[in-house]
C-alpha cells in the first residue's frame, strides 16, 4: 500500500481516466482493486501512422513516492524481430524524458498517468526513426532508411501488434481482449490501406538496424489472415458488424429493408459503441493552431485545441 499522498493521487488519476474519451483517444487502462500501485494500459496506434490500429501494452508500477517521482513503465508488445520505436526497446525498456529514461524535460508533480499515456502515444508518429537523437546527421541515406523503417513498423504493426497480441495476449492484459477484437472488426478502412501499401511489396526483403537480420514481406499471407479474422469476429459480434455496415452504407444506394424504423429514436448508446473508425474532429492538425482555438469538425460540431505538458496538441470536444 502506498503513502497517503500516493493513494490520493492514484484515486485522482483513476477519476481523470473515467472522464476520458477512451475510445476516441485510443487509450485504455485497467485498475486492479487488489493492487492499486499497478496499472495495465493499452494505447492504440494513431491513425495515418505506421502504428494505426495496433495494440501497444504498457505495465505501469507506482512507488510510494508518486507523484514526487514518476512510475516505472515497461513496454509489453514485444517481438524479437522488430523494435517498434527508437524509444521502445525489445527488452521492454521505455525511453521517455518525463520518466527519467531519456534526455529532455523531466517529471513534475503536475503530471499524471494520462500525461504519460499521451506522451507514449505521441511517440507513434508517421516517421518514428526521427525520434532517435542525431538521426539527421547520423545517416547518409536518411530518407531511404526512414521509409524502410516505416514499412517494417507498418508490417509488424499488423503481424505482431494486432494478430499476435490478440492470439497471445501478454499475461495481465487479457482484460482488453474484447476491446481489441471489436476495434479490429471496425477497422476495415485501415486494412484496405494496408493492402494497397503492402501487396506490391510481396516477397521483398527489408533490412533495418531495428529489425534484426531483416524481414521478407509476406503480404499475401497476412491479407488472407485479415479476411479470416474479420469473418470470425463478424460471427462473434454480429450486432457490432450489422451496425457498422449500416453506418458505412449511409448516403449510398442501399435500400431500406425496414422503413418503419425511420420514425424511431436511435439507440444512442448502441450507436456510440459501434461507431466506425471515421474522423470527427477537424481535418487540419491541431498543432497548426493556438491552444483554445475553436473550429467546426467533420461531424459539424465544435472542437477546441487542447495543449498538454508534453507540448502535444489535440482536438477535443469542449466540456458542456
Tell what function each PLM region has.
Residues 113-124:
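Short amphipathic C-terminal alpha-helix that caps PH/PH-like domains
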Residues 130-260:
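Charge-rich (especially acidic), low-complexity segments
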Residues 11-24, 36, 65, 69, ...:
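Generic recognition of well-structured, leucine-rich alpha-helical segments
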Residues 1-100, 104-111, 115:
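Strand-helix-loop interaction patch of compact alpha/beta domains
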Residues 37-47, 177, 288-295:
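Short, charged low-complexity linear motifs
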Residues 259-320:
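Arg/Lys-rich, low-complexity, intrinsically disordered basic segments
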Amino acid at each position: 500500500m502506498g503513502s497517503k499522498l500516493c493513494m490520493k493521487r492514484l484515486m485522482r488519476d483513476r477519476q481523470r481516466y473515467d472522464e476520458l474519451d477512451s475510445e476516441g483517444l485510443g487509450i485504455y487502462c485497467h485498475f486492479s482493486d487488489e493492487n492499486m500501485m499497478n496499472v495495465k494500459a493499452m494505447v492504440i496506434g494513431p491513425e495515418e501512422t505506421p502504428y494505426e490500429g495496433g495494440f501497444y501494452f504498457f505495465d505501469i508500477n507506482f512507488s510510494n513516492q508518486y507523484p514526487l517521482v514518476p512510475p516505472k513503465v515497461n513496454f509489453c508488445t514485444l517481438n524479437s524481430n522488430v523494435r517498434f520505436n527508437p524509444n521502445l526497446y525489445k527488452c521492454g525498456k521505455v525511453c521517455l524524458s518525463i520518466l527519467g529514461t531519456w534526455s529532455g524535460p523531466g517529471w513534475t508533480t503536475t503530471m499524471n498517468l494520462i500525461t504519460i499515456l499521451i506522451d507514449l502515444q505521441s511517440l507513434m508518429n508517421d516517421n518514428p526513426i526521427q525520434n532517435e537523437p542525431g538521426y539527421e546527421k547520423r545517416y547518409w541515406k536518411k530518407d531511404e532508411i526512414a521509409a524502410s523503417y516505416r514499412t517494417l513498423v507498418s508490417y509488424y504493426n499488423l503481424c505482431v501488434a494486432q494478430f499476435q497480441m490478440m492470439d497471445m495476449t501478454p499475461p495481465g492484459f487479457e482484460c482488453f481482449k474484447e476491446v481489441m477484437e471489436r476495434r479490429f472488426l471496425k477497422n476495415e478502412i485501415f486494412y484496405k490501406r494496408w493492402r494497397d501499401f503492402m501487396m506490391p511489396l510481396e516477397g521483398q526483403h527489408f533490412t533495418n538496424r531495428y529489425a534484426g537480420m531483416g524481414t521478407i514481406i509476406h503480404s499475401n499471407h497476412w491479407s488472407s489472415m485479415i479476411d479470416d479474422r474479420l469473418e470470425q469476429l463478424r460471427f462473434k459480434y454480429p450486432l457490432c458488424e450489422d451496425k457498422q455496415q449500416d453506418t458505412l452504407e449511409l448516403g449510398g444506394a442501399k435500400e431500406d429493408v425496414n422503413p418503419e424504423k425511420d420514425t424511431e429514436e436511435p439507440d444512442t448508446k448502441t450507436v456510440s459503441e459501434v461507431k466506425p473508425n471515421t474522423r470527427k474532429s477537424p481535418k487540419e492538425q491541431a498543432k497548426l493552431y493556438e491552444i483554445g482555438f475553436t473550429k467546426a469538425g467533420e461531424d459539424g460540431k465544435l472542437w477546441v485545441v487542447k495543449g498538454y505538458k508534453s507540448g502535444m496538441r489535440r482536438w477535443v470536444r469542449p466540456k458542456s
